[in-house]
Amino acid sequence: MAVVTVPDKNLVLRDAEEIKNYLAAIGIDYERLESEPRISPDAAPEEILAAYAPEIEKLKATGGYATADVIDIKPETPNLDGMLQKFRPEHWHDEDEVRFIVKGHGRFHIAPKNGDVAAITMEAGDLIRVPRGTHHWFDLCEDRTVRAIRLFQDTAGWTPHYTSSGVEQKYS
């Protein structure tokens, strides 16, 4: 299950309901899907998408998402550090960022316009929706592994708009 940390308040949340409520208050949707995977997290991307098709179709219908894919990041990913340099600076998107973790761990930092930065450490079974325009950044956890289903409203996919604020340097 996710863990939410708010460093400036010295706050750590581990309870699913507290996490959901706290994140909702800063505009982030969080859900915990089944804890037992219905397919191997190492399955082919098309098998993962098929296994989670009911959830994907529901999200597409309610959020206007046009497409889904599977991102697979691991320590041996070619140019991993270069890839992470695109995710780590604070940025925002013209569309929602939706991620469902199927393997590994990742950490989203959310920088609300009128609130404290919150770090959401996610693991398999965690689903997050970061609304369009929300300032945030992402990094891997210690295992440097994450496999996630991503949903997009625009078939062109993930396009960041960097803020150049440097705020991420205080929290990384």
Where are these regions (language model features)?
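N-terminal leader/capping segments at the start of a protein or of a new domain
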Residues: 1-65
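Conserved short histidine dyad/triad with adjacent acidic residue
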Residues: 70-94
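Short, surface-exposed beta-strand-loop junctions and turns on beta-sheet-rich folds
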Residues: 114-116, 144-145
